[in-house]
């Protein structure tokens, strides 16, 4: 490869980096993933139509509760899962508690178990924004993958947090009464090492 070709590659690479930086910005956010546990079993038990109706009600409920948080934003919905971001870890926990309390009440009312598992993590990510609205269009980076892995470890009706949002939210919510939440308990599972992540969470 001659020097001229190398120079052209370098120029192209620099232009790609500049274009990426023009469309993206780095930011520290509280990341939240949630999905319905055993959604396939739900479809097998009640049939596709009833399961789809339940999932639609679930999605409407998620968006209704999210509307109570001015600093929360839906990034993506896929199937029965949501990717949401918040400015504060405490808001992510409040949102999660309200969602699960509503799901418990709904499941008891209709006799159809629909439970979420939720993962929360804080990290610096690359934010792609809508040019007109100034809202996040998509998020990229290792921290997004890490949050998804935290969520994947959860069980039905469980909220899992990595260390920083756990400590931050627990302190911020200390002594605060949450509507519809009788008792709030925090359980420290200790550090957990995930595949592909250097430091334990």
Predicted feature locations:
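Catalytic beta-strand-to-alpha-helix segment of the class III nucleotidyl cyclase homology domain
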Residues: 63, 67, 83-200
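Short coil-to-helix leader/linker segments, especially the first N-terminal amphipathic alpha-helix
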Residues: 2-16
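Catalytic NTP-binding/metal-coordinating core of nucleotidyl cyclase/transferase enzymes
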Residues: 14-102
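Short acidic/polar alpha-helix capping motifs at helix-coil junctions
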Residues: 3-4, 28, 153
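Short low-complexity stretches enriched in small and charged residues
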Residues: 9-10, 38-41, 73-77, 114-118, ...
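Intrinsically disordered, low-complexity glycine/proline-rich and charged
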Residues: 1-5, 196-201
